[in-house]
C-alpha cells in the first residue's frame, strides 16, 4: 500500500483520501455504491453483516472490498453510529464527461456519533451530545455541544467527583479529551472517546475561534471570559464540529456558562437509583420519564428530560413554571393547545439541518406546517388573564414572510430528496416552469408519435418506451418485427421483441433530456437559495422553537397533574421537607391495588429518620418517593401528594442497593462504601440523603459499627435531611442519644403461614423483620423454613440473655468513644490553628520551618 505507483489511478486517489482520514471508515463513492477497501472493508463487513469481496491486487494480494448501495446508505450509517463508529463520506464532485482519469472526489462530511444531524441517525426523544474535557492539574474544563439544536455550554467542575457527575448527567455519545489528560479512569466508562492533540486546547486559538463563530470582539457578553479551562475545551470542540461538518455552523450562536449552584446536584448513583430516564435494567419502562413524558413534540420530550436531570433551585423561576401550569389547568387549555403543538413536530432539529444546509424537502414542509401553527397558539394565549402565561410566547417573532416563502416555493407533498426533482412548486420560478413544460410535454408528444407510427406501419403491437441505458425506443414484438420500415435502426434485441430508434425520436430525446437536466439543475439552485433566505432569521426561529418546546412541556405537565391527581407544591425558605400523603409516581401507576400514601416530616429538629420494617414492606419505595416528589417540585411540576412544602435543597444523594462492579474489581461492599464516602464528604444541611441498608457485605459487628457511625455523622456533623433504612434494630436506640432523630417503621401482619404488608409508615421502631415469612413468599422450601424457625428460636433465646447489655454497651460507646473521637478531632484542629496563628513565616530559617512542619504533622 505504501508504493502508490503499484496501484491504478483510482486506487491511488482512494489511498490519498484514506491517508487524510486514517482512524475512521471511508465510504468511497463509485457509481451507485459506496465502497470500502482493505481493513475498512473487513471491519464494515463484520459490523454491517455485508459481503466481503475482492478487487484487483496490492503487492500481489487481492484487495478486500465491501460496499453498500447509495440509496440505502442512511440505514447503514445509523447502525455504524449506534456502534460508536465514525464515517467519512467521499462523493464524486467532478463531471465524468470532462474528467481525464478518475473523477474528482472529496470528503464532503464526516459522520460521528456526536455530530450527526440526519433524522434517521438520531434518537428522537433524547439529546445527542458531544463533550470535550480539559485538565490542568486538579482543575477541569468541560464543554458540551448539541449540534442538533446549537446549544453550547461550558463549565468548570470543581473536582473529580463533580466532573464525573456532570459527565454522567449529560451522557455524551462522543467525548473528546486532551492527549495529556491524567485521570483517564474518569473517562473510561464513556463511549466514543476521541484523543485530541494539546494544541487544539490553546486558549488564544479558542478565543479567536469562538469570536469568529459569534461575530464578536470578545466574550464578555456571554459572561464566560473567566472560565479559562472551559474556553479551552470549547475551542477544541468547536473546531472538531467544523472539521466534521465541512460547512459553517450558523445555528451555534452563543456560549453559556453552567453555574452548578443554580441546580440541584445529582450524582450517578442517585440518577440510577431514582430511575429517572433509565431503569436499573437499562430500559426505559417504569421510569419517572415514562410516567411524566407525554409531550406531543420530540423537542418538548427532550426539554422535559433536561429539567428532570437538572432541577433548578431558584424559587422565583419555579413559581413561574408552576403558575403557568396552574393557568393552563384553570382555563382548560390543554386540549385546545396540544393539537397545534402536535403539528409543530421537531422544529428544533429541522432548523439545525437548515443551518447545515442538509435539510430535506420534507423538513421544509414540516417547518412550514410549524410556522402555520404559531398564530393560532398566540391567539389562544393572548386571551388569557395570567400574565405568566401570556408572556410565554412573547419571545416568538413574526414569521409571515418566511411562511409565505415556503408556501410559494415547496409543493404540498415533495419527494424525499431534492435530487429526485419535483420539489419546487409551479409558479415559483418562470424559467423552471418553461423547462418543465418542455419536459412534461414529452408524454403527449410520445402518445401522438406512437399512434402515428402504428398507423403508418400497420403494426398494432408497436410501443414507445424509455430506459436509462438506451433512452427512448420503438418496440415491436418478434412476430411483427419483419414489418419494421427500412429507416428503423435496430438498437436492442430481446427474447420476444426488437427495439428500434428513428431520427425524429432521437432528436426529441436529446431535447427532453436537456430540458429535464436543466430543470433539475435549476431546481437545486432554487432550493439552495431557500437556505440563503431562511438563514438570516435562524436565531429568531431557534428562539421560537425553544419557546414552543417549553409550552409543550408545561402543557404536558398540566395534563399529567390533572390525569394523575397531582398538587402544586409550596416552597419555603426554611430547611425541611413536609409531605402529606405522598405517593410514588411510578409505583402507583403499575400497582394493581390502591397505593398506600404516606407522610414525610423532615426539618432541623427532625432531620434523621431511622426506618425499620420487613423486607418488601415498602421502605425503599417510601424513601424513593420522597426524593422523587422533591425532584419533581424543583422541576416546576406538580407532585403526587395531598400537599407538599419543601425548603431549599442543594443535593440529593441515594445509597440504595448495590452489586459487584466486576469490571473495576470492586465488591458489593466496596461499591457501597464508595457511595457512602461520597455522601459523607459532599452532603450539607440542605441535602436530602437516602440510605438503605448500609453495612451489608461484612461481619455483623463491622456493619453495625459502620451504620451507627454513618448515621451519627449525618445527624451530628452534617445535619442533612436523612432517611436511613436499616435491619440493624440496635440503631433504633439512636433517637434516645441524638437530637433531631426519630424512629419510623413499616409494619406487617402475620397469620399462620401468610404475611400481609401494611405499607403504612408509623412512628416508632418495628417489632420484628418477618424475614422468614418473606423467604417463604420467595419460594424457599418449607423444610428449610421449618429448620430456620428452629434455629431462630434458639438464637433469639440466646441473644435475649445479653440483648439489654449489648444495647447498653452501644449507648455507652456512643456517649464516650464517639464524643471522644469528635473531641480529639476538634482539639487537634484547635492546636494546629493556634500554632499557625503564632507563626511568622518571614522570621523562620529553613531549618526552623522544617521543624514546624514536623510538629504540625504530629498534631494532624
From Swiss-Prot:
Pfam families the UniProt entry points to: MutS_I (PF01624), MutS_II (PF05188), MutS_III (PF05192), MutS_IV (PF05190), MutS_V (PF00488)
Annotated transmembrane regions: none
SUPFAM superfamilies noted in UniProt: DNA repair protein MutS, domain I, DNA repair protein MutS, domain II, DNA repair protein MutS, domain III, P-loop containing nucleoside triphosphate hydrolases
InterPro entries, per database record: DNA_mismatch_repair_MutS (IPR005748), DNA_mismatch_repair_MutS-lik_N (IPR007695), DNA_mismatch_repair_MutS/MSH (IPR017261), DNA_mismatch_repair_MutS_C (IPR000432), DNA_mismatch_repair_MutS_clamp (IPR007861), DNA_mismatch_repair_MutS_core (IPR007696), DNA_mismatch_repair_MutS_N (IPR016151), DNA_mismatch_repair_MutS_sf (IPR036187)
GO biological-process terms attached to the record: mismatch repair
Keywords, in A-Z order: ATP-binding, DNA damage, DNA repair, DNA-binding, Nucleotide-binding
Range of residues in the leader sequence: none
GO CC annotations, alphabetized: cytosol
One Gene Ontology MF term: damaged DNA binding
Residue numbers binding ATP: 613-620
Top-level taxon of origin: Bacteria
SMART domains in the cross-refs: MUTSac (SM00534), MUTSd (SM00533)
Annotated function: This protein is involved in the repair of mismatches in DNA. It is possible that it carries out the mismatch recognition step. This protein has a weak ATPase activity.
Family: Belongs to the DNA mismatch repair MutS family.
Name used for this protein in its record: DNA mismatch repair protein MutS
Annotated organism of origin: Pasteurella multocida (strain Pm70)
Taxonomic lineage of the native organism: Bacteria, Pseudomonadati, Pseudomonadota, Gammaproteobacteria, Pasteurellales
Gene: mutS
Amino acid at each position: 500500500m505504501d508504493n502508490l505507483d503499484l496501484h491504478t489511478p483510482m486506487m491511488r486517489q482512494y489511498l490519498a483520501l484514506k491517508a487524510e482520514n486514517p482512524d475512521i471508515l471511508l465510504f468511497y463513492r463509485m457509481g451507485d455504491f459506496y465502497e470500502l477497501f482493505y481493513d475498512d472493508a473487513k471491519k464494515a463487513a463484520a459490523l454491517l453483516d455485508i459481503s466481503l469481496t475482492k478487487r484487483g491486487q496490492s503487492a500481489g494480494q487481492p484487495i478486500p472490498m465491501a460496499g453498500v448501495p447509495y440509496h440505502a446508505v442512511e440505514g447503514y450509517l445509523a447502525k455504524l453510529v449506534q456502534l460508536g463508529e465514525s464515517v467519512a463520506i467521499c462523493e464524486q464532485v467532478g463531471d465524468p464527461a470532462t474528467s481525464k482519469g478518475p473523477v474528482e472526489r472529496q470528503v464532503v462530511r464526516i459522520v460521528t456519533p456526536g455530530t450527526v444531524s440526519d433524522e434517521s441517525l438520531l434518537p428522537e426523544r433524547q439529546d445527542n451530545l458531544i463533550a470535550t474535557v480539559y485538565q490542568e492539574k486538579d482543575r477541569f474544563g468541560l464543554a458540551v455541544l448539541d449540534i442538533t439544536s446549537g446549544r453550547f455550554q461550558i463549565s468548570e467542575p470543581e473536582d473529580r467527583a463533580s466532573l464525573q457527575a456532570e459527565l454522567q448527567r449529560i451522557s455524551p455519545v462522543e467525548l473528546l479529551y486532551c492527549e495529556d489528560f491524567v485521570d483517564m479512569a474518569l473517562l473510561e466508562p464513556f463511549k466514543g472517546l476521541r484523543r485530541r492533540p494539546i494544541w487544539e486546547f490553546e486558549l488564544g486559538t479558542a478565543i479567536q475561534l469562538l469570536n469568529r463563530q459569534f461575530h464578536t470582539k470578545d466574550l464578555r457578553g456571554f459572561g464566560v471570559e473567566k472560565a479559562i479551562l472551559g474556553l479551552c475545551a470549547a475551542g477544541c470542540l468547536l473546531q472538531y464540529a467544523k472539521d466534521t461538518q465541512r460547512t459553517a455552523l450558523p445555528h451555534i450562536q452563543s456560549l453559556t456558562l453552567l453555574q452548578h449552584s443554580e441546580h440541584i446536584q445529582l450524582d450517578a448513583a442517585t440518577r440510577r437509583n431514582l430511575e429517572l430516564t433509565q431503569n436499573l435494567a437499562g430500559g426505559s419502562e417504569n421510569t419517572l420519564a415514562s410516567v411524566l413524558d407525554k409531550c406531543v413534540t420530540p423537542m418538548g420530550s427532550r426539554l422535559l428530560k433536561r429539567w428532570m436531570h437538572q432541577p433548578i433551585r431558584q424559587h422565583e423561576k419555579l413559581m413561574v413554571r408552576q403558575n403557568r401550569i396552574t393557568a393552563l389547568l384553570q382555563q382548560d387549555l390543554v386540549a385546545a393547545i396540544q393539537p397545534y403543538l402536535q403539528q409543530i413536530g421537531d422544529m428544533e432539529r429541522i432548523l439545525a439541518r437548515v443551518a447545515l444546509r442538509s435539510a430535506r424537502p420534507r423538513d421544509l414542509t414540516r417547518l412550514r406546517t410549524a410556522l402555520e401553527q404559531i398564530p393560532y397558539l398566540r391567539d389562544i394565549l393572548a386571551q388569557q388573564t395570567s400574565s405568566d402565561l401570556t408572556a410565554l410566547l412573547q419571545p416568538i417573532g413574526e414569521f409571515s414572510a418566511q411562511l409565505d416563502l415556503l408556501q410559494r416555493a415547496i409543493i404540498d407533498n415533495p419527494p424525499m430528496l431534492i435530487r429526485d426533482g419535483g420539489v419546487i412548486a409551479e409558479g415559483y420560478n418562470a424559467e423552471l416552469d418553461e423547462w418543465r413544460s418542455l419536459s412534461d410535454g414529452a408524454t403527449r408528444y410520445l402518445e401522438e408519435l406512437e399512434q402515428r407510427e402504428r398507423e403508418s406501419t400497420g403494426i398494432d403491437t408497436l410501443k414507445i418506451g424509455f430506459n436509462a441505458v438506451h433512452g427512448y425506443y420503438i418496440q415491436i414484438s418478434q412476430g411483427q418485427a419483419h414489418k419494421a420500415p427500412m429507416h428503423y435502426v435496430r438498437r436492442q434485441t430481446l427474447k420476444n421483441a426488437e427495439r428500434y430508434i428513428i431520427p425524429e425520436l432521437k432528436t426529441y430525446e436529446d431535447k427532453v433530456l436537456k430540458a429535464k437536466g436543466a430543470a433539475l439543475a435549476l431546481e437545486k439552485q432554487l432550493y439552495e437559495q431557500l437556505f440563503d433566505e431562511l438563514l438570516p432569521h435562524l436565531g429568531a426561529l431557534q428562539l421560537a422553537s425553544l419557546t414552543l418546546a417549553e409550552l409543550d412541556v408545561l402543557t404536558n405537565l398540566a395534563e399529567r397533574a390533572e390525569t394523575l391527581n397531582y398538587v402544586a407544591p409550596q416552597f419555603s425558605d426554611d430547611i425541611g421537607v413536609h409531605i402529606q400523603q405522598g405517593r410514588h409516581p411510578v409505583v402507583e401507576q403499575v400497582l394493581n391495588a390502591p397505593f398506600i400514601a404516606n407522610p414525610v416530616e423532615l426539618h432541623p429538629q427532625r432531620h434523621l429518620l431511622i426506618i425499620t420494617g420487613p423486607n418488601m414492606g415498602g421502605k425503599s419505595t417510601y424513601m424513593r418517593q420522597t426524593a422523587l416528589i422533591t425532584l419533581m417540585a424543583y422541576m416546576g411540576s406538580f407532585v403526587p401528594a395531598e400537599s407538599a412544602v419543601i425548603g431549599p435543597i442543594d443535593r440529593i444523594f441515594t445509597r440504595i442497593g448495590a452489586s459487584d462492579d466486576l469490571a473495576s474489581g470492586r465488591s458489593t461492599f466496596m461499591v457501597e462504601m464508595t457511595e457512602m464516602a461520597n455522601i459523607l464528604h459532599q452532603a450539607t444541611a440542605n441535602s436530602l440523603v437516602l440510605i438503605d441498608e448500609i453495612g451489608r457485605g461484612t461481619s455483623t459487628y463491622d456493619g453495625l459499627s459502620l451504620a451507627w457511625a454513618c448515621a451519627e455523622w449525618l445527624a451530628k456533623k452534617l445535619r442533612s435531611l436523612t432517611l436511613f433504612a436499616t435491619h440493624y434494630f440496635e440503631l433504633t436506640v439512636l433517637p434516645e442519644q441524638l437530637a433531631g432523630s426519630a424512629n419510623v417503621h413499616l409494619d406487617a401482619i402475620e397469620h399462620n403461614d401468610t404475611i400481609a404488608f401494611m405499607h403504612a409508615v408509623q412512628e416508632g421502631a418495628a417489632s420484628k423483620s418477618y424475614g422468614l415469612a418473606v423467604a417463604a413468599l420467595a419460594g424457599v422450601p418449607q423444610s428449610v423454613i421449618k429448620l430456620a424457625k428452629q434455629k431462630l428460636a434458639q438464637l433469639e433465646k440466646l441473644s435475649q440473655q445479653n440483648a439489654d447489655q449489648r444495647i447498653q454497651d452501644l449507648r455507652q460507646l456512643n456517649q464516650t468513644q464517639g464524643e471522644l473521637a469528635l473531641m480529639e478531632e476538634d482539639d487537634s484542629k484547635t492546636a494546629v490553628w493556634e500554632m499557625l496563628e503564632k507563626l511568622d513565616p518571614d522570621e523562620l530559617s529553613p531549618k526552623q520551618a522544617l521543624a514546624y512542619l514536623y510538629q504540625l504533622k504530629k498534631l494532624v
